[in-house]
Protein backbone atom coordinates (compact mmCIF):
# COMPACT_ATOMS: atom_id res chain seq x y z
CA UNK A 1 0.00 0.00 0.00
CA UNK A 2 2.76 2.46 0.87
CA UNK A 3 4.45 1.75 -2.44
CA UNK A 4 1.22 2.58 -4.28
CA UNK A 5 0.89 5.81 -2.34
CA UNK A 6 4.48 6.74 -3.09
CA UNK A 7 4.00 5.95 -6.79
CA UNK A 8 0.81 8.01 -6.87
CA UNK A 9 2.52 10.99 -5.23
CA UNK A 10 5.42 10.79 -7.67
CA UNK A 11 3.31 10.36 -10.81
CA UNK A 12 0.54 12.85 -10.06
CA UNK A 13 1.36 16.01 -12.00
CA UNK A 14 -0.46 18.28 -9.54
CA UNK A 15 1.39 17.01 -6.47
CA UNK A 16 4.64 16.91 -8.42
CA UNK A 17 4.18 20.50 -9.58
CA UNK A 18 3.43 21.74 -6.08
CA UNK A 19 6.43 19.91 -4.65
CA UNK A 20 8.83 21.05 -7.37
CA UNK A 21 7.42 24.56 -7.46
CA UNK A 22 7.77 25.05 -3.73
CA UNK A 23 11.32 23.74 -3.88
CA UNK A 24 12.05 26.61 -6.26
CA UNK A 25 10.77 29.08 -3.67
CA UNK A 26 13.45 28.12 -1.13
CA UNK A 27 15.86 31.00 -2.02
CA UNK A 28 13.07 33.53 -1.54
CA UNK A 29 12.00 31.98 1.77
CA UNK A 30 15.60 32.08 2.99
CA UNK A 31 15.92 35.75 2.03
CA UNK A 32 12.69 36.61 3.81
CA UNK A 33 13.66 34.60 6.89
CA UNK A 34 17.05 36.27 7.20
CA UNK A 35 15.60 39.75 6.78
CA UNK A 36 12.97 38.99 9.44
CA UNK A 37 15.59 37.61 11.85
CA UNK A 38 17.85 40.63 11.35
CA UNK A 39 14.98 43.09 11.85
CA UNK A 40 13.82 41.38 15.05
CA UNK A 41 17.20 40.39 16.48
CA UNK A 42 16.58 40.54 20.27
CA UNK A 43 19.36 42.94 21.22
CA UNK A 44 18.32 46.30 22.66
CA UNK A 45 21.19 48.23 21.08
CA UNK A 46 20.36 46.82 17.63
CA UNK A 47 16.65 47.62 17.94
CA UNK A 48 17.46 51.16 19.09
CA UNK A 49 19.76 51.57 16.10
CA UNK A 50 17.07 50.46 13.63
CA UNK A 51 14.63 52.89 15.24
CA UNK A 52 17.09 55.78 14.97
CA UNK A 53 17.51 58.01 11.95
CA UNK A 54 20.78 56.35 10.97
CA UNK A 55 19.28 52.87 10.99
CA UNK A 56 15.94 53.74 9.42
CA UNK A 57 17.25 53.21 5.88
CA UNK A 58 18.55 49.76 6.81
CA UNK A 59 15.24 48.92 8.47
CA UNK A 60 13.40 50.09 5.35
CA UNK A 61 15.69 47.97 3.17
CA UNK A 62 15.14 44.85 5.30
CA UNK A 63 11.38 45.44 5.30
CA UNK A 64 11.48 45.76 1.51
CA UNK A 65 13.25 42.39 1.27
CA UNK A 66 10.66 40.86 3.59
CA UNK A 67 7.71 42.26 1.62
CA UNK A 68 9.27 41.13 -1.68
CA UNK A 69 9.59 37.55 -0.37
CA UNK A 70 7.25 36.56 2.48
CA UNK A 71 4.93 39.43 1.63
CA UNK A 72 4.61 38.12 -1.94
CA UNK A 73 4.28 34.39 -1.28
CA UNK A 74 1.07 34.11 -3.29
CA UNK A 75 2.81 35.54 -6.35
CA UNK A 76 5.93 33.39 -5.90
CA UNK A 77 3.93 30.19 -5.33
CA UNK A 78 1.76 30.78 -8.39
CA UNK A 79 4.77 31.58 -10.56
CA UNK A 80 6.93 28.62 -9.52
CA UNK A 81 4.19 25.98 -9.40
CA UNK A 82 2.85 26.92 -12.82
CA UNK A 83 6.41 26.88 -14.19
CA UNK A 84 6.95 23.38 -12.79
CA UNK A 85 3.61 22.27 -14.26
CA UNK A 86 4.48 23.69 -17.67
CA UNK A 87 7.82 21.86 -17.64
CA UNK A 88 6.22 18.55 -16.63
CA UNK A 89 3.13 18.43 -18.87
CA UNK A 90 3.48 16.78 -22.29
CA UNK A 91 0.50 18.24 -24.16
CA UNK A 92 2.05 21.55 -25.21
CA UNK A 93 5.78 21.41 -25.85
CA UNK A 94 6.40 24.75 -27.58
CA UNK A 95 6.76 27.45 -24.94
CA UNK A 96 6.05 26.44 -21.30
CA UNK A 97 6.38 30.09 -20.24
CA UNK A 98 2.70 30.57 -21.12
CA UNK A 99 1.73 28.50 -18.09
CA UNK A 100 3.13 30.98 -15.51
CA UNK A 101 1.77 33.94 -17.47
CA UNK A 102 -1.73 32.51 -17.81
CA UNK A 103 -1.79 31.33 -14.18
CA UNK A 104 -0.90 34.76 -12.84
CA UNK A 105 -3.51 36.42 -15.07
CA UNK A 106 -6.10 33.83 -14.01
CA UNK A 107 -5.39 34.43 -10.33
CA UNK A 108 -5.72 38.20 -10.76
CA UNK A 109 -8.96 37.76 -12.73
CA UNK A 110 -10.39 35.41 -10.09
CA UNK A 111 -9.51 37.71 -7.19
CA UNK A 112 -10.33 40.99 -8.94
CA UNK A 113 -13.43 41.77 -6.79
CA UNK A 114 -11.15 41.74 -3.74
CA UNK A 115 -8.60 44.04 -5.37
CA UNK A 116 -5.41 45.35 -3.85
CA UNK A 117 -1.93 43.93 -3.45
CA UNK A 118 -3.00 41.78 -0.50
CA UNK A 119 -3.85 38.91 -2.87
CA UNK A 120 -0.12 38.26 -3.26
CA UNK A 121 0.43 37.92 0.49
CA UNK A 122 0.80 34.73 2.56
CA UNK A 123 -2.87 34.64 3.56
CA UNK A 124 -3.78 34.07 -0.08
CA UNK A 125 -1.11 31.44 -0.74
CA UNK A 126 -3.48 28.44 -0.51
CA UNK A 127 -5.97 30.12 -2.83
CA UNK A 128 -3.13 31.02 -5.21
CA UNK A 129 -1.99 27.39 -5.32
CA UNK A 130 -5.52 26.12 -6.02
CA UNK A 131 -6.21 28.65 -8.78
CA UNK A 132 -2.78 27.96 -10.28
CA UNK A 133 -3.42 24.22 -10.50
CA UNK A 134 -6.93 24.70 -11.88
CA UNK A 135 -5.78 27.21 -14.50
CA UNK A 136 -2.85 24.99 -15.55
CA UNK A 137 -5.15 21.98 -15.89
CA UNK A 138 -7.72 23.99 -17.84
CA UNK A 139 -5.03 25.44 -20.10
CA UNK A 140 -3.72 21.93 -20.80
CA UNK A 141 -7.18 20.62 -21.65
CA UNK A 142 -7.84 23.49 -24.06
CA UNK A 143 -4.40 23.03 -25.64
CA UNK A 144 -5.28 19.39 -26.26
CA UNK A 145 -8.65 20.32 -27.77
CA UNK A 146 -7.15 23.01 -30.01
CA UNK A 147 -4.35 20.69 -31.16
CA UNK A 148 -6.91 18.08 -32.12
CA UNK A 149 -8.83 20.50 -34.34
CA UNK A 150 -6.24 22.79 -35.82
CA UNK A 151 -2.48 23.20 -36.01
CA UNK A 152 -1.28 26.65 -36.88
CA UNK A 153 2.07 26.94 -38.62
CA UNK A 154 2.74 30.15 -40.50
CA UNK A 155 5.74 29.87 -42.79
CA UNK A 156 8.33 32.61 -42.71
CA UNK A 157 7.53 34.06 -39.28
CA UNK A 158 9.25 33.74 -35.92
CA UNK A 159 8.80 30.63 -33.81
CA UNK A 160 7.38 32.64 -30.92
CA UNK A 161 4.69 34.08 -33.19
CA UNK A 162 3.38 30.60 -33.94
CA UNK A 163 3.52 29.75 -30.24
CA UNK A 164 1.57 32.91 -29.41
CA UNK A 165 -1.11 32.18 -31.98
CA UNK A 166 -1.48 28.62 -30.71
CA UNK A 167 -1.85 29.94 -27.16
CA UNK A 168 -4.32 32.71 -27.97
CA UNK A 169 -7.58 30.78 -27.56
CA UNK A 170 -6.43 28.60 -24.61
CA UNK A 171 -5.11 31.62 -22.71
CA UNK A 172 -8.19 33.76 -23.29
CA UNK A 173 -10.61 30.98 -22.33
CA UNK A 174 -8.65 30.01 -19.21
CA UNK A 175 -8.42 33.57 -17.88
CA UNK A 176 -12.07 34.22 -18.75
CA UNK A 177 -13.28 31.09 -16.94
CA UNK A 178 -11.33 31.99 -13.80
CA UNK A 179 -12.54 35.58 -13.93
CA UNK A 180 -16.19 34.58 -14.38
CA UNK A 181 -15.89 31.99 -11.58
CA UNK A 182 -14.57 34.61 -9.18
CA UNK A 183 -17.32 37.05 -10.16
CA UNK A 184 -20.02 34.41 -9.64
CA UNK A 185 -18.68 33.59 -6.16
CA UNK A 186 -18.64 37.28 -5.31
CA UNK A 187 -22.24 37.78 -6.49
CA UNK A 188 -23.52 34.65 -4.73
CA UNK A 189 -21.97 35.38 -1.34
CA UNK A 190 -21.82 39.20 -1.66
CA UNK A 191 -18.54 39.09 0.22
CA UNK A 192 -15.13 39.86 -1.24
CA UNK A 193 -13.51 37.64 1.40
CA UNK A 194 -14.93 34.56 -0.33
CA UNK A 195 -12.33 35.12 -3.05
CA UNK A 196 -9.72 33.98 -0.55
CA UNK A 197 -11.59 30.72 -0.07
CA UNK A 198 -8.53 29.03 1.47
CA UNK A 199 -8.41 31.31 4.51
CA UNK A 200 -12.21 31.69 4.43
CA UNK A 201 -12.83 27.94 4.80
CA UNK A 202 -10.17 27.52 7.48
CA UNK A 203 -11.54 30.47 9.46
CA UNK A 204 -15.08 29.07 9.25
CA UNK A 205 -13.82 25.72 10.49
CA UNK A 206 -11.93 27.12 13.47
CA UNK A 207 -14.66 29.62 14.33
CA UNK A 208 -16.93 26.78 15.49
CA UNK A 209 -14.18 25.24 17.64
CA UNK A 210 -13.27 28.36 19.58
CA UNK A 211 -9.80 29.08 20.95
CA UNK A 212 -9.34 26.00 23.12
CA UNK A 213 -7.11 22.95 22.93
CA UNK A 214 -9.08 21.26 20.08
CA UNK A 215 -8.45 24.28 17.83
CA UNK A 216 -4.74 24.26 18.61
CA UNK A 217 -4.43 20.53 17.93
CA UNK A 218 -6.38 20.85 14.68
CA UNK A 219 -4.19 23.79 13.65
CA UNK A 220 -1.06 21.70 14.19
CA UNK A 221 -2.57 18.75 12.31
CA UNK A 222 -3.67 20.77 9.25
CA UNK A 223 -0.37 22.65 9.19
CA UNK A 224 1.61 19.41 9.10
CA UNK A 225 -0.68 17.87 6.48
CA UNK A 226 -0.11 20.90 4.25
CA UNK A 227 3.63 20.64 4.84
CA UNK A 228 3.46 16.95 3.88
CA UNK A 229 2.15 17.94 0.45
CA UNK A 230 4.83 20.62 0.14
CA UNK A 231 2.56 23.57 1.01
CA UNK A 232 3.85 26.17 3.48
CA UNK A 233 1.32 25.32 6.18
CA UNK A 234 2.26 28.06 8.64
CA UNK A 235 1.84 30.85 6.12
CA UNK A 236 -1.30 29.30 4.63
CA UNK A 237 -2.93 29.31 8.08
CA UNK A 238 -1.65 32.76 9.04
CA UNK A 239 -5.16 34.20 9.22
CA UNK A 240 -6.14 31.37 11.59
CA UNK A 241 -3.05 31.78 13.80
CA UNK A 242 -3.99 35.42 14.39
CA UNK A 243 -7.35 34.32 15.79
CA UNK A 244 -6.04 31.56 18.09
Predicted segments — roles?
Residues 219-244:
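Acidic, glycine-rich loop-and-beta core segments that form the ion-binding/anion-interacting portion
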Residues 40:
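Acidic/histidine-rich, metal-coordinating catalytic segments
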Residues 43-55, 238-244:
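Membrane-interface interhelical connector segments
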Residues 1-29, 35-37, 53-54, 58-228:
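Signature of multi-pass transmembrane helix bundles
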Amino acid sequence: PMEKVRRFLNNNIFIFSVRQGLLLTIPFLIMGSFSLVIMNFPVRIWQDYLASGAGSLLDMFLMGIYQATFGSLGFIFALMISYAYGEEQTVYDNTPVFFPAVSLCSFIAFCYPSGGLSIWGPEWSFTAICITLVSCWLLTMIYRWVAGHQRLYTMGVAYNFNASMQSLVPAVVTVAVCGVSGLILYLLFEDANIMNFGSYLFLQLFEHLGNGLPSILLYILISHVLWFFGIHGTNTLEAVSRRL
